[in-house]
Design a protein with these regions (language model features):
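Scaffold/interface architecture of coatomer-like assemblies
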Residues: 19-310
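N-terminal secretory signal peptides that target proteins for export/translocation
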Residues: 1-2
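Bacterial N-terminal signal peptides
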Residues: 5-16
Length: 310
């Protein structure tokens, strides 16, 4: 009886197939909304949060785009990955850094959107996810208090892995990296870390604690690499010493996150580059305003290749 039913169903399916199948017509439509988190400042570094949609002009690979999404002081929920360097080089400074991180997380989760969440990572020669995304400050703070310094610095691995997790989440993606310098033990390299962050639409805010102001005692190469990572994602690098300057850096990050514009467009007519990377440029009227946003994004084919492991 079952075989008879299957046979009748198969016959019905075959009957629905034309005797001479027509060639398929493939229509490709780009429906991806490209979102940009934008910070605007004046020449004194003051945040400007009063601009309107018509004040912004966007170019994708040199082609002007139509703005389809605009939010001033966006309340899109934040997913914030906090990466703490616990390598041996952090030494006695680590406890001061952790105190400032704790204050930052308390303020972040206590203010703003009640859907904001944080995740906590530590990294030395390996990367450890200490707390997945949560709103429970006590849970994250407890993990912070247990951190100790030892080992090397897998900075790029930490950025790469945290970006992969952020890519799966809704809302705004932010990564705050507390470190004292450059990478020493990662499997991933600088370019892989940057690409992962850009694919995840993640703003990088490296906080490079530099108790030594003389270049001779600092990892200037590591600082330059993180400055480039921040600029490529639309974030900003901070170089505080300990104490009040470190607390001020975290306060500045919070202010920027609360004053961001969210601008989006559906790409049209933008020529593709060989690596599928689209360069973005966004401008606002007036010579005294500076726009901070990510340098670009990867096209769909690049994302598909990455996700399939090719």
């Amino acid at each position: 009886m079952i075989r008879q039913a299957v046979g009748l169903l198969l016959a019905a399916v075959l009957a629905a197939v034309p005797a001479h199948p027509q060639p398929d017509t493939v229509i490709r439509v780009n429906v991806r909304l490209v979102r940009m988190l934008v910070t605007v400042k004046d020449t004194n570094g003051q945040l400007i949060g009063s601009l309107n949609k018509n004040d912004f002009t966007i170019f994708d690979n040199g082609v002007k785009q139509d703005i389809a999404l605009f939010e001033r002081q966006t309340e899109q929920p934040l997913s914030v990955a906090v990466l703490v360097d616990t390598s041996a080089s952090t030494g006695i400074e680590l406890r001061y850094e952790l105190d400032s991180v704790s204050k930052f997380l308390r303020a972040l989760l206590g203010e703003g959107n009640p859907r904001d969440t944080v995740a906590l990572y530590s990294f030395n020669w390996q990367v450890n996810l200490l707390s997945s995304y949560t709103r429970r400050f006590a849970r994250v703070d407890q993990q912070l208090k247990q951190l100790k310094s030892e080992g090397g610095t897998s900075l790029y691995d930490a950025i790469y892995l945290a970006s992969r997790e952020l890519e799966l989440r809704d809302g705004r993606h932010v990564m705050v990296i507390v470190t004292d310098g450059g990478d020493t033990t990662s499997v991933k390299d600088f370019h892989q870390a940057l690409e992962a962050a850009q694919l995840a639409d993640t703003l990088l805010y490296p906080v490079l604690v530099v108790p030594i102001t003389n270049d001779a005692g600092r990892n200037v190469g590591g600082e330059n690499a993180l400055t480039t990572l921040a600029a490529g994602t639309g974030g900003r690098v901070f170089l505080p010493t300990l104490g009040a300057e470190l607390d001020r850096a975290f306060s500045d990050i919070l202010r920027e996150l609360r004053t961001q514009y969210l601008v989006g467009f559906y790409p049209k007519d933008a020529p593709l580059t060989k690596d599928r990377f689209h360069t973005l440029k966004i401008s606002v009227p007036g010579p005294n305003l500076r726009v901070i946003t990510r340098s670009g994004y990867y096209g769909e084919s690049s994302e598909s290749s990455r996700r399939s492991g090719r």
